[in-house]
Amino acid sequence: MTRHGKNCTAGAVYTYHEKKKDTAASGYGTQNIRLSRDAVKDFDCCCLSLQPCHDPVVTPDGYLYEREAILEYILHQKKEIARQMKAYEKQRGTRREEQKELQRAASQDHVRGFLEKESAIVSRPLNPFTAKALSGTSPDNAQPGPSVGPPSKDKDKVLPSFWIPSLTPEAKATKLEKPSRTVTCPMSGKPLRMSDLTPVHFTPLDSSVDRVGLITRSERYVCAVTRDSLSNATPCAVLRPSGAVVTLECVEKLIRKDMVDPVTGDKLTDRDIIVLQRGGTGFAGSGVKLQAEKSRPVMQA
C-alpha cells in the first residue's frame, strides 16, 4: 500500500462522521449543540434579561423573571396582538367588499344576458322561403347568437400574454389568520396573566452585604428555613403565600408534613409550592435539558 492510501481523504465510503461534520458546516438540516456551563443561567437570574433579579417574580410553572422585564413583555405582546387584530379586520373588510363587488358584477351580467335574449326574440312569423328567414332576422338587426356546435378547441389553447401589463397576473395578499388574544409565557408557551405572577423573596447569605456585593459572589442566597446554600445544583421551590425560597429537601421533609408556610403560618396546598426552574450545572446528571436544537431547511436530492 502506498502512502496515498493512508490519507484520511482516500476512503471510498462517505462515513457517518463525515456526513455529520459536513451537515454542521453547511447549515442545512436540524442543528444540535450541547450547552456548556457558560451557556446556562443561574437560578436567580431573569429568563429574559439573564441578569440577577432585583424585583423577582415567578410564574406558576416556576420560571423566574424580573418584574419590569416581564411586564414590559406582556405590554409589548398586547400591542402586537392589537396590531395583528387590526390588520386582520382590515383584510377581512377588504375581502368582504371584493365579494360584494363580484356579486354585483355577476348580477349585472345576468341582467345583460337576459336583455340580450329578449331583444333577439322575433315578433312576427317568417317566411321559410325567403333569405331573411334563413338568418332569422334582417341583416341590419342581426344579433350574434350562441354557437350550437361543439366549442372550438383553438380557444382552449389560447393562453393570456402574461408579459403584457394589462394581462399580468396579480399577486394575491397572504390570507391572515385570526390572531389569538392570549398572552403566553416566553419560556413555557402557556397563557400568562399579570395576576399569575408571584413575588419572590430570596434570603441573602449575608444581610449586611448590598445588592452589588451579592452579584459578585457565587453563593448569594440561602434557604429561608434550613439556611442551606442555594445554587444551580440545589433544587428549590417558592412558597406562594410568603414568596420565600426553600430547598425541595426542606419541602419534602418538613413542610409537607403540616402543609403550613413556615414564614407566615398560612395553610398550603400543592398549588402553592412552585418548583423553581433552575439553569443546571452543565452536567448531564443535573436533570436539566442541555441539548439545544434548531430546525433548518433540508437539502434533499
Curated annotation (Swiss-Prot):
Its main location: cytoplasm. It comes from the Eukaryota. Pfam families: zf-NOSIP. The keyword Phosphoprotein applies. GO terms for molecular function: ubiquitin protein ligase activity. Residues 55-75 are annotated as: U-box-like. Its EC number is 2.3.2.27. The keyword Cytoplasm applies. GO terms for cellular component: cytoplasm; nucleus. The modification Phosphoserine is found at S36, S107. It catalyses: S-ubiquitinyl-[E2 ubiquitin-conjugating enzyme]-L-cysteine + [acceptor protein]-L-lysine = [E2 ubiquitin-conjugating enzyme]-L-cysteine + N(6)-ubiquitinyl-[acceptor protein]-L-lysine. Interacts with NOS1 and NOS3. Interacts with PP2A holoenzyme, containing PPP2CA, PPP2CB, PPP2R1A and PPP2R2A subunits. PANTHER family: ENOS INTERACTING PROTEIN (PTHR13063), NITRIC OXIDE SYNTHASE-INTERACTING PROTEIN (PTHR13063:SF10). This is Nitric oxide synthase-interacting protein. The gene is NOSIP.
